[in-house]
């Protein structure tokens, strides 16, 4: 009998790759795109909408009983054991500006546990994926988090958006930088989390992130041997949360610096 999680992993990899090809077509013709604002520093293009519709249609065709949560078109209300979470283009600001740092992200949750995560970066032909209990992979090669011994080695990724105040960000960055840390931000939380799983970055922190940006990457980091803050999947899907994840030694050093974020209430924009 075919394992239902393996079936969904295979489908997620195929759908994400095809969605990334579609997104790349839009990226190469982005001057013709209709672009709208969802809020401060938060844009959506026709590419985001059409790529999500493509992914949703593919999931509905293959798994008609599964639930779906998407960044652009929300959540289906039918209860199901399997729920798919979609970010059609993570890094839209980069996408519309012509910066080749964005990705397509699909994850799948089974009875409250993330079991599949796929991130495709078509600009670099990088295909990241993880299956619960079976490891994390980049282009077929098993990933492992960095062996850095502390924040003085390598760079961490830091997420920042309009839901986070500058003062809140500096609560973390000020002591981090004073301890000799270095940080990187590319405006795609999903891609930075994949970089952590691949050992390119040593950790990632954001005071508030949405489920479609992080669930795939958090599974990859877990399967690549990393440490992370525990989270409630349903709460994450409905409201988002603060996250910290990374190489174990770096994670341990960052935990007290990031503790402020556990009680952080994000800014809500109307």
Where do the model's predicted regions map?
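Short loop segments at secondary-structure junctions
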Residues: 109-113, 123, 132-135, 141, ...
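N-terminal subdomain of lithium-sensitive/metallo-dependent phosphomonoesterases centered on the IMPase/IPPase/PAP
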Residues: 1-89, 264-270
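Short glycine/threonine-rich catalytic loop with a Thr-x-Gly-x-Asp
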Residues: 48, 95-98, 185-186
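Small-residue (primarily alanine) positions within well-ordered alpha-helices
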Residues: 12, 16-19, 117, 217, ...
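An extended, acidic
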Residues: 144-270
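Solvent-exposed alpha-helices and their adjacent loops that cap or buttress functional pockets
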Residues: 36, 76-78, 111, 129, ...
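DPxDG-like acidic metal-binding loop motif
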Residues: 78-137
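Residue-level signal for inorganic ion chemistry
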Residues: 23, 48, 59, 92, ...
């Amino acid at each position: 009998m075919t394992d239902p999680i393996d079936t969904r992993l295979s489908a997620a990899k195929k759908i994400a790759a095809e969605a990334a090809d579609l997104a790349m077509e839009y990226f190469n013709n982005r001057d013709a795109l209709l672009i709208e604002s969802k809020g401060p520093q938060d844009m959506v293009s026709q590419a985001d909408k059409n790529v999500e519709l493509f992914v949703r249609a593919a999931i509905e065709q293959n798994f008609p009983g599964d639930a779906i949560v998407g960044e652009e078109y929300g959540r289906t209300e039918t209860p199901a054991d399997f729920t798919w979470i979609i970010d059609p283009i993570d890094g839209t600001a980069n996408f519309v500006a012509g910066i080749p740092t964005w990705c397509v992200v699909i994850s799948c949750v089974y009875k409250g546990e993330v079991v599949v995560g796929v991130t495709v970066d078509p600009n670099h032909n990088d295909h990241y994926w993880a299956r619960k209990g079976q490891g994390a992979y980049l282009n077929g090669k098993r990933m492992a988090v960095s062996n850095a011994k502390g924040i003085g080695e390598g760079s961490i990724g830091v997420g920042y958006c309009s839901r986070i105040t500058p003062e809140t960000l500096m609560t973390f960055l000020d002591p981090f930088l004073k301890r000799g840390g270095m940080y990187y931000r590319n405006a795609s939380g999903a891609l930075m989390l994949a970089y952590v799983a691949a050992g390119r970055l040593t950790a990632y922190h954001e005071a508030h992130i949405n489920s479609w940006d992080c669930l795939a990457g958090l599974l990859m980091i877990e399967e690549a041997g990393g440490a992370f803050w525990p989270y409630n999947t349903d709460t994450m899907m409905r409201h988002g949360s603060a996250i910290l994840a990374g190489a174990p030694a770096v994670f341990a050093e960052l935990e007290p610096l990031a503790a402020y974020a556990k009680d952080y209430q994000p800014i809500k924009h109307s």
